[in-house]
A protein has these predicted regions:
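A polyanion-binding, active-site-adjacent surface
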Residues: 1-186
Length: 186
């Protein structure tokens, strides 16, 4: 029997709420993982490989995320839920536009409500600004935990930014994931 999250994913699979539906997407990338996860990651949007496979974070950024989850949290992706701010790939991997983020927000809100994670880790500016409802950037916001719903939100860098930036962003992302581990244990 399909779960409530499965039903929302099925409904989202035919979404036409914004122009991304007709911008060359292969499919909606709804999210993946444990529907009862205590930890949820929220990124920006699917890239080319994610669009092809229909799964979030399967390219180089996803490989880094998987590696850091295992090293810093001791868990694998099947024990978390991974979603994005927008569910369709923006053309040319451009940033999602405000109207696209707004059109997709109800899908993310339903995911958050149904999964009820104890800890949400936002990956990068778009997810962080949306869920914290702020204009501040990730560089100012990361390094702390924020009350969020019935748990906490921990902002960190997007893995793609870490791949580009190397040393210091990687060390900071590791520290943020340690913070997530501590919040899960609390």
């Amino acid at each position: 029997m399909p779960t409530a999250l499965d039903l929302v994913a099925e409904e989202a699979s035919t979404c036409q709420r914004c122009k991304l539906a007709d911008a060359g997407r292969t499919q909606v990338v709804f999210g993946m993982g444990d529907p009862h996860a205590d930890l949820m990651f929220v990124g920006e949007g699917p890239g080319a490989e994610e669009d092809r496979q229909g799964l979030p974070f399967v390219g180089r950024s996803g490989q880094l995320l998987d590696k850091l989850m295992l090293e810093e949290l001791g868990i694998t992706r099947d024990r978390v839920f991974i979603a994005n701010t927008v569910k369709c790939r923006p053309p040319g991997n451009r940033d999602p536009e405000p109207d696209e983020i707004a059109a997709c927000r109800p899908w993310l809100e339903q995911q958050l409500s149904l999964i009820e994670p104890k800890v949400v880790v936002t990956l990068g500016n778009f997810a962080t600004k949306l869920l914290l409802e702020t204009k501040e950037g990730i560089t100012k916001l990361r390094g702390r935990s924020y009350p969020f719903r019935s748990g906490v939100l921990i902002p960190t860098f997007h893995p793609a930014a870490v791949l580009r930036g190397g040393g210091e962003p990687l060390a900071q992302m590791r520290a943020d994931l340690v913070r997530a581990k501590q919040a899960l244990a609390a």
